[in-house]
């Protein structure tokens, strides 16, 4: 459950970078 949250956070942070 924790890993999923971390993955989602990383995706949200990385997506606007593009």
Swiss-Prot record:
Pfam families according to UniProt: Ibs_toxin
Lineage: Bacteria, Pseudomonadati, Pseudomonadota, Gammaproteobacteria, Enterobacterales
Gene deletion effect: None seen. An isbB overproducing strain cannot be made in the absence of the sibB gene.
Keyword Transport included in the entry's annotation: no
Keywords, alphabetical: Toxin-antitoxin system
Induction, per UniProt: The sibB sRNA probably represses expression of ibsB mRNA, either by destabilizing the transcript and/or preventing its translation. Expression of the proteinaceous toxin is controlled by antisense sRNA SibB.
Known role: Toxic component of a type I toxin-antitoxin (TA) system.
Organism: Escherichia coli (strain K12)
Sequence similarity: Belongs to the Ibs toxic protein family.
Gene: ibsB
Note, other: Part of the SIBb repeat region (formerly known as QUAD1b), encoded on the opposite strand from the sibB (formerly knowny as ryeD) RNA.
UniProt protein name: Small toxic protein IbsB
